[in-house]
């Protein structure tokens, strides 16, 4: 049965308590319960006023039954109507008597709540030291508190809990808000909320400015810091109604909405809509949360300044008020200052004093020199002031000497559209010019939902992760540990990551995810030669992630790599500047089809190297060209999961260390290093009664008696030419055995150095020469 939206809503009138459960949306009328949209444990209430399926949630807002279906299923109004129509087709039209009864029931509930409010208010006492207000920073604030117990909203309220009386527009007490010591809040069952408020009267700016705040603690904070009148709306849902009423009562007042800054953006949107309705302004706190959160974090003076900064109108451009004569009479430095003011003092110059950047929407964007020069020329033209290219260049060059110098972005910050995440402590902050962010992830950081998992809430990332790990849980944990190392910038673990595998196995996605976690500003690409060269190392300073793509052809001892990952100071010799020594505190991530080959036998590389192999090559038809973009949109979930999973960072470190000597890593090293592969054919004996070391001059060779002879035979049998000298073989042997978990022992005898090593049985079939001569056997 096809129905339009209006007809569906009309047909559903009075039936929502049956319709919603039929769609899988469980609701209980007039009970605080988990929100079916955001998952909040007790912030949702279904009141079904006038049979319209009405509801409200402190986080999601309010609406009717159709709006709830839209939000739960994430569909358009027409699609929501189709879902509702599918279960209402057989229902009879709503009986007008039922609707009238619902209205009467609502009126009766309001009257009962108002009467109960009067009764409870008569049993309150005025006092100080309320536990909730003390926690909010106001231990000396006089307030109304319960003198006995009361049951409301599924909560047992105790003596001493805070009571906030709510009045309608006629000044009549119609409801109460009860607030416990731990911050639980309820109003009386069936009581009026929309259009009600509690007012904190102030003396300052009386009749000139009026504040509206969401919660009581926020209102108390604003009132305390400004001395001005503040109305308490209780929630963002009531802001619009209260703002309209305030404008009717106070037509000449400036109305300011002291809104909450929510991660979801809901508080900001509701406040903006209310401000539009009353021609008011919105004042957002400098933290995520409310103005009381800012007060408790930064103190009174800083928060008072932030409040007045938030309502200060934007400064006019001096070019709107100056005359041509005034501007022309100015010195070059004065003209540069006026231009700086025109741009809202949101300009900075790079460390070299050449490139200008402008702060916009959370990031410092580089201004192309020619474009900026044309903009400055446009300001001259606006005033009809004479100019030349030389004059414009002179003003721009002078401006570069006046404005602040751009700093490097903090390594611990990851930028999102709606703020920055501090990866050291997991806190999320609003954007600030002082963060010096140059790029942002083009997604919003979102609040967690109950039961959040990677599999459900980051499906694209999960598919990549599970495929890269071959479906093995322990391998997934290792990959996540590597990503956490990048996220937390744990260069101090003295490890470096090497991801290997065939083309199309997901290695590049690993590098892209690592870049997102480190932040685009904090990541750079290089070659391993860059790490080894003092001249080229200058390009690596200031980054927290160094990517080394496609390094498999490189072969060397990795001295620079060892020094950087070991936390040693390395020499840097930049062009046209004096050489110096510095630490490069960065995580190094190499991405190769084949593992790198190191000639170092001291163990300096092996004890820092973590190899993660992606064995499966994804078929071309299965590859998703949009995978990176999809994972980018899931970044907030990924970050939360990593920080929660590795709340003890040492768990991630131990996983990476266990990966170093895993069978997978050993097999990769064996494929890359023939000497290391040969060591895999050795096993230890309880005593030093095994093979002798031998040397190259002993003739004839005895491959079962002399270890060095066996090594030469292995290299020859497999066609390898570059064999190690006896000395280098002897030096590297203990280190390589240790990677296999074997202890090397030796003793000096008359026949030479005897070891505790012997050849494994598989040596005879794989490469050991077959000879019937017992002297060579």
Swiss-Prot record:
A molecular function (GO) term: DNA-directed RNA polymerase activity
Domain Toprim: 208-296
SUPFAM superfamilies: P-loop containing nucleoside triphosphate hydrolases, Winged helix' DNA-binding domain, Zinc beta-ribbon
Residues reported to bind ATP: 501-508
Alphabetized UniProt keyword annotations: ATP-binding, DNA replication, DNA-binding, DNA-directed RNA polymerase, Helicase, Hydrolase, Metal-binding, Nucleotide-binding, Nucleotidyltransferase, Primosome, Transcription, Transferase, Zinc, Zinc-finger
Annotated GO CC locations: DNA-directed RNA polymerase complex
Coiled-coil annotated residue ranges, if any: none
GO biological process, one term: DNA replication, synthesis of primer
Zinc finger (CHC2-type): 35-60
Catalytic activity: ATP + H2O = ADP + phosphate + H(+)
EC number: 2.7.7.-, 3.6.4.12
Domain spans labelled SF3 helicase: 474-627
Described purpose of this protein according to its UniProt entry: This protein acts as a DNA primase generating di- to pentaribonucleotides; the predominant product being the dimer pppApG. It complexes specifically to the P4 origin of replication (ori) and its cis replication region (crr). It also acts as a DNA helicase.
Subunit structure: Homohexamer.
Name of the protein: Putative P4-specific DNA primase
Taxonomic source organism: Enterobacteria phage P4
Encoding gene (name): Alpha
């Amino acid at each position: 049965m096809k129905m339009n939206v209006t007809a569906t809503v009309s047909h559903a009138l009075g039936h929502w308590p049956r319709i919603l459960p039929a769609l899988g949306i469980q609701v209980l009328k007039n009970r605080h319960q988990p929100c079916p949209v955001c998952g909040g444990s007790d912030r949702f209430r279904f009141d079904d006023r006038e049979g319209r399926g009405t509801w409200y949630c402190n986080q999601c807002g309010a609406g009717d039954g159709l709006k709830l279906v839209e939000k739960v299923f994430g569909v358009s109004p027409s699609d929501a109507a189709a879902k509702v129509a599918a279960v209402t087709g057989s229902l009879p039209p709503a009986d007008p008597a039922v609707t009238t009864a619902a209205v009467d029931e609502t009126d009766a509930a309001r009257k009962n709540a108002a009467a109960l409010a009067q009764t409870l208010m008569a049993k309150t006492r005025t006092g100080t030291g309320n536990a909730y207000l003390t926690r909010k920073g106001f231990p000396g604030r006089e307030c109304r508190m319960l003198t006995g117990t009361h049951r409301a909203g599924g909560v047992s309220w105790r003596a001493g809990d805070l009571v906030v009386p709510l009045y309608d527009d006629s000044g009549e007490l119609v409801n109460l808000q009860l607030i416990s010591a731990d911050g639980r809040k309820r109003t009386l069952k069936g009581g009026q909320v929309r259009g009600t408020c509690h007012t904190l009267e102030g003396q300052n700016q009386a009749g000139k400015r009026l504040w509206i705040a969401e919660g009581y603690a926020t209102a108390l904070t604003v009132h305390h810091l400004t001395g001005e009148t503040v109305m308490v709306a209780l929630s963002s849902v009531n802001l619009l109604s209260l703002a309209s009423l305030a404008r009717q009562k106070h037509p000449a007042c400036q109305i300011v909405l002291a809104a909450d800054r929510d991660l979801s953006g809901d508080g900001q949107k509701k406040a903006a809509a209310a401000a539009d309705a009353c021609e008011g302004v919105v004042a957002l706190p400098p933290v995520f949360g409310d103005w009381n959160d800012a007060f408790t974090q930064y103190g009174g003076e800083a928060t008072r300044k932030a409040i007045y900064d938030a309502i200060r109108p934007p400064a006019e451009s001096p070019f709107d008020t100056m005359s041509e004569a005034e501007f022309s009479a100015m010195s070059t430095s004065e003209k540069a200052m006026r231009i700086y003011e025109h741009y809202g003092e949101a300009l900075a110059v790079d460390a070299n004093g050449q490139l200008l950047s402008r702060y916009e929407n959370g990031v410092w964007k580089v201004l192309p020199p020619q474009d900026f020069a044309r903009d400055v020329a446009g300001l001259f033209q606006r005033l009809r002031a004479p100019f030349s290219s030389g004059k414009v260049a002179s003003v721009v060059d002078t401006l570069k000497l006046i404005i602040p110098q751009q700093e490097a972005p903090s390594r611990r910050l990851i930028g999102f559209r709606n703020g920055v995440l501090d990866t050291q402590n997991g806190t999320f902050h609003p954007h600030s010019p002082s963060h010096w962010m140059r790029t942002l992830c083009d997604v919003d950081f979102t609040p967690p939902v109950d039961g959040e998992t990677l599999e459900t809430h980051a499906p694209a990332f999960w598919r990549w992760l599970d495929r890269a790990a071959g479906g093995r849980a322990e391998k997934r944990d290792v990959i996540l540990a590597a990503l956490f190392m990048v996220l937390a910038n744990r260069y101090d673990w003295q490890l470096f990551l090497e991801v290997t595998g065939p083309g199309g196995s997901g290695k590049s996605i690993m590098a892209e995810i690592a870049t997102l976690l480190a932040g685009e500003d904090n990541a750079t690409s290089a070659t391993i030669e860059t790490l080894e060269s003092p001249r080229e190392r200058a390009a690596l300073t200031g980054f927290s992630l160094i990517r080394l793509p496609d390094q498999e052809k490189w072969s060397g001892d990795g001295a620079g790599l060892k020094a950087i990952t070991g936390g040693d100071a390395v020499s840097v010799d930049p062009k046209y500047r004096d050489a110096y020594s510095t630490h490069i505190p960065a995580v190094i991530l190499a991405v190769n089809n084949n593992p790198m080959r190191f000639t170092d036998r001291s163990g300096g590389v092996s004890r820092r190297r973590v190899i993660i192999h992606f064995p499966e090559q994804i078929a071309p038809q299965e590859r998703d060209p949009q995978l990176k973009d999809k994972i980018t949109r899931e970044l907030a979930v990924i970050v939360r999961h990593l920080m929660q999973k590795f709340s003890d960072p040492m768990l991630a470190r131990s996983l990476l260390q266990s990966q170093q000597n895993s069978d997978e890593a050993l097999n990769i090293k064996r494929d890359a290093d023939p000497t290391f592969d040969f060591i895999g054919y050795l096993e230890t004996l309880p005593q030093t009664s095994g093979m002798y070391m031998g040397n190259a001059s002993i003739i004839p060779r005895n491959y079962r008696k002399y270890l060095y002879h066996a090594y030469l035979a292995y290299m020859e049998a497999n066609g390898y030419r570059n064999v190690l000298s006896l000395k280098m073989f002897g030096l590297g042997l203990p280190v390589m055995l240790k990677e296999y978990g074997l202890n090397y022992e030796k003793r000096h005898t008359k026949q030479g150095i005897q070891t505790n090593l012997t050849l494994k049985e598989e040596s005879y079939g794989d490469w050991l020469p077959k000879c019937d001569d017992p002297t060579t056997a």
